[in-house]
């Protein structure tokens, strides 16, 4: 399990693991470690220079900031595709390699909103698009190497996919 280092995210991860463990009658003997990852902190995965980007977050609020980010219109920020690919690669590299593995990544609504918008090719996010409390994105990868893999995801009941390599080419 990976999590933003913010305590409420670490606590959420621990409670989700506890809830999953209690959903079965079988005794669990595993110990799932929660590894804190800076790329999952808000809006850490997308920021290059917080002194440049920070004032825009305070001025625009989360929704305005993420809309500016997905349009690559903020100073001190990574290109949206680069920022999202960094997070996706983290998820790819921390996923268990066996066929029955499942991993959990706990982050913030702003990170989730940005990822969903960018991988969906959207340039505008509305309040209705914004992730609800505890709403999650289900992702998986097909392929043995990240850059050659296909990302598949389910968001609000819709299944989508994209080639990581082709996605990265859109940055140019």
Where are these regions (language model features)?
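Phosphate-coordination/substrate-recognition cap region in phosphate-metabolizing enzymes
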Residues: 1-63
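Beta-strand elements within well-structured catalytic alpha/beta cores of enzymes
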Residues: 2-3, 99-107, 111
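Acidic, low-complexity terminal tails and accessory targeting/binding regions
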Residues: 22, 40-53, 97-101, 113-172
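Flexible loop/turn segments at secondary-structure boundaries
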Residues: 9, 112-113
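Extended recognition/assembly regions associated with phosphoester-bond processing machinery
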Residues: 12-13, 108, 136
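A mid-sequence, solvent-exposed acidic-amphipathic segment
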Residues: 69-103
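Hydrophobic, Leu/Ile/Phe/Ala-enriched alpha-helical segments that form helix-helix packing faces
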Residues: 12-24, 87-95, 115, 119, ...
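Extended, charge-rich low-complexity interaction segments
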Residues: 58-82, 164-172
């Amino acid at each position: 399990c990976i999590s933003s280092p913010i305590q409420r995210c670490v606590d959420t991860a621990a409670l989700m693991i506890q809830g999953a463990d209690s959903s079965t009658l079988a005794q669990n003997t595993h110990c799932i470690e929660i590894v804190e990852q800076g790329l999952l902190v808000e809006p850490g995965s997308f920021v290059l220079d917080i002194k440049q980007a920070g004032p825009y977050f305070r001025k625009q609020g989360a929704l305005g900031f993420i809309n500016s980010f997905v349009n690559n219109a903020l100073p001190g920020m990574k290109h949206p595709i680069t920022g999202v690919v960094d997070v996706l690669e983290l998820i790819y590299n921390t996923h268990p390699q066996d066929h029955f593995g499942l991993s959990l990544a706990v982050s913030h609504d702003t990170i989730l909103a940005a990822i969903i918008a960018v991988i969906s090719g959207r340039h505008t996010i509305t309040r209705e698009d914004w992730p609800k409390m505890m709403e999650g994105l289900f992702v998986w990868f097909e392929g043995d190497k990240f850059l050659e893999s296909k990302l598949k995801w389910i968001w609000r009941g819709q299944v989508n996919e994209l080639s990581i390599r082709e996605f990265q080419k859109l940055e140019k």
